[in-house]
Each structure stands twice: as C-alpha cells, then as structure tokens.
Amino acid sequence: MAKRIIYNEQARRALERGIDILAESVAVTLGPKGRNVVLEKKFGAPQIINDGVTIAKEIELEDHIENTGVALIRQAASKTNDAAGDGTTTATVLAHAMVKAGLRNVAAGANAITLKKGIDKATEFLVGKIQDNSKPISDSNAIAQCGTIAAGNDEEVGQMIANAMDKVGKEGVISLEEGKSMTTELEVTEGMRFDKGYISPYFATDTERMEAVLDEPYILLTDKKIALVQDLVPVLEQIAKTGKPLVIIAEDIEKEALATLVVNRLRGVLNVAAVKAPGFGDRRKAMLEDMAVLTNGQLITEDAGLKLENATLDMLGTGRRITINKETTTIVAEGNEQAVKARCDQIKKQMDETDSSYDKEKLQERLAKLAGGVAVIKVGAATETEMKDKKLRLEDAINATKAAVEEGIVPGGGTTLAHLSPILKEWADKNLKGEELIGANIVEASLTAPLMRIAENAGSNGAVIAENVKTKPFNDGFNAATGEYVDMSSAGIVDPAKVTRSGLQNAASIAGMVLTTECIVADLPEKKDSASPAGAPGMGGDFDY
C-alpha cells in the first residue's frame, strides 16, 4: 500500500494536533468537579464515564498522522494504568504540557536529543523527590481517603475498600461483580488468586478487557499434562449436557488438545477456559490439592489411581465465579468453610514441623492464599450505564489503594508536582546547563499543568492558583471541591506516590519520543469508491454481493 512521508516541523505539528484532541477529551474529567464523557457504542446503550484510559482507548481519528499522535499519548495513559491502575488523566495532561512546551523549543532551533537528556535527568531527580516526600500508609483511614479520591470523591466507596482490606489483608484479593440491587455491597467469601493466566487469549469472554469471566463453573483439576483431547472427551460431553462453563487447571495442555478446546469455545459448543497450574513439582501438587479443597472437588492424579478419561462430574470442583486474565486467575468459591479450615490447620501443623525457612515461607504463602479469602464488592446502580461508570471508578480506587500500600502517599490534587516545580528549578540551575537545562525547564513548566486543569474544571483561574500553591508549605494545596487552600493530608486529599511517579515517568518518556521525531511514515487515506451504477445487469444497485 502507498505511504505518505512527512518530515521535520510538519511531522511534529501533525502529531501535536492529534495529541491536543486526545488531551482535551480526557482532561475534562480531571478533579472533583471534572465532567463526564459519553462514548457512543455501535451496539447497545452509550457509555457515560469519567475514566481517562477508557476514553483514550475509544478515540480514533480520520487522519492517520494525527491518529499516530493519539496513539502515543494513549500509550502514556495505558502504561500508567498497567503500572499503578490510576492516574491516567494526570499522565495525559502532563505529557500534553511537556510536548507543547518542547515543540516550541524545537521549532526555535533547540537540539531535540539534548532536550530529551534534560527531560530524563529532571524526571529522575523528581522521582527521587516523590519517594522522599511519600508517607507510608499506617491505618485504614488513610486507605479510605486514597480510595475516596480515586473513585471521584465517593466516600462510601473509599470506606468500603478500607473495610475490604481490613478483612482480607493488604495483599488480599478484592474482586468486583455486578450486583442485583441499587446499593453497592461488600461480601467476603472463600477464594484464592494465583499468578497464572489463560493458556490462550481465545478463552477471553470480555475482549475489551481481555478477561475470561465464568459464572458457576465446573473446575477440573489435574497434575497431568493433557496431550490428547480423547482423554477429555468423556468429561466434556457430561459438562456440555449441563450447559455450565468449565475451567481446566492442569500441568499443561498440548497444542492438539488446546486447539480443540479453543474451537469448541469459539463455536459456542462449550464455554471453557484452560490455565496452567501454579508452582513446580510437589509444591504444584500441594497447591492443586488446596484448590480441590476450596472448590469441593478432587485432584485427578494417577497417584490416587484416578484417570482423566474416567473422570465424572462428582470429581469436579465448583465455584461461584472465576476471573482469568493474561497474568492471574481468581477463584471465588462457594461456602466450604469446614474443609478449608481443616486444610489450613494441616498446613499450620506442617509449618511447625519443618526446619527449612524456605519451606516455611512457601507454606505461609499457601496458607495466606487459602485462608485470606476474597472480598467481593457487588456494584449496585439504578441503570446499566451508571453501573459501568461506577465499576470503572471502583477499579481505579482498588488499584490506587494497593499502590498506596506499596509506595506510600503524597499530597493529592496536583499539589505534589506543583510544589516540586521550584525545587526542580533550583536543582537544574545548579546542575545542568545549555539545552539540557532547557529540557529540565520544560518539565518544570509542565508540573503545574494537572493542578491548573483541576482548578479550571472547578471554574477557578488555574495559573493564579498554581502560583499561590507554590508559595505555601509542601502539604498545603488547593481543594477544588470547596475552592479553599487547605492542608491536603488533613483534608484527606492524598494520592498514591506510585501513581504520581508512574504518571510523570510515562509522560516524560512519550514527550521525549515526540520531540525527537523527525519523520513520519503513514498510510495514505483510502480513496472512497464511488457507488456502483444502480440497476446494472445482475447487480442490486449499491448492494455488495
């Protein structure tokens, strides 16, 4: 296919136009008074949301070059979402500000490579400062504050996540389900999560999120490598009659058997997903036995004289819901408390008997997985559109609280970055010179962009507020919800340090890439064919056959 090639300033300006469009669409959602965005869907009701990365994923422009700019900024949002689970809008606004300031300097004749070096050095300095100023999370109140801010100032959600973390521990599993009522409820059930995802992406039931979600599934557990599909046929036929989904957790599944399962899944004959069992050797077998206890099933192993081809439905485990993505599998089990408790006691006894610290550690991991349980938040709302928005906010809030537990919290509302702006300027003036200093100044000028946008979305003058905040102590900032300057930590306006750090790093990375672009190669726009002449012999007018 023919390509068009664009050079120099023209290339960078075309990228900038795409970046402007995406940044503006996403930035309207920033802060406590940020607005919503409506996404039109080809099928079903439109989606009304407030989530930066979801909006970014929806934007496709007609112009291929501008679309490349959109894709670059979308990457900053996506990477931040993958690393910290929140802060995608902040990353987009930061990247946009850095690109705008950087392009002005490149147009004026600055060397883009040296500018990028300055941007990278400034970012490295700021990451250290964010870590220095972060405070570890000490109580559930701080967790609730973090969740509240990430969920768009919804205190009920923040409190619910804090309660969930109290019940399942800070490393525990919190899963989301669509509820049946108007209210959002918290429930703690038996369950576990392990670090193995689906063997093939074709098992995903939700292609947008690339997840396989199976309700009320049967669970086949075996420590055997499944090489031939014939071994599975008897049990698959029994399950197909029940109409329920099936999850296979095995040592491995060979290509032939896997291909058969995928084809059956795609044709809708059987809703099935397959996962490799976690761990190795005896430890893998022990973990599979834990799962068998949890799901009220049996581990099909030749050590116990059980063969796959003779498996019956009674030997299979059952669960309330299983969610599988490319990296993890979460099992939410039905009530089976007595058996789980007995299994936990057995593991504790093994821990007392072993002298090896390594074995003790691994047994402790198994105990935590089995005893920790899963906190299930059932999202309630009046309409499906509201439920989808609420679910995205809850997801952000859960990710933000986990990020806060990992790396601590910093003052929120764009305050931390705004306060670091004069600190960076002072450091850069002493340590950098020439165009590297200009690169650092680009970052310094961009640091107030999130705060300015939050203030503007609340109807205030962003530039004035950013300057006022810089003169105040580090913890003080602008509360956009009330329009007052407050101590952010006392007011409960906090962000996870990991979210702020990831957003800054990804924004700087994308800005550096855009500034050092000198040429773009893109597809030529396709010429639209004029409609075929109506009524031609054997043709149905404009219809394609």
Curated annotation (Swiss-Prot):
NCBIfam families: GroEL, PRK00013.1, PRK12849.1, PRK12850.1, PRK12851.1. CDD domains: GroEL. This is Chaperonin GroEL 2. It holds the Pfam family Cpn60_TCP1. It comes from Prochlorococcus marinus (strain MIT 9215). It is found in: Cytoplasm. The gene is groEL2. It catalyses: ATP + H2O + a folded polypeptide = ADP + phosphate + an unfolded polypeptide. Forms a cylinder of 14 subunits composed of two heptameric rings stacked back-to-back. Interacts with the co-chaperonin GroES.
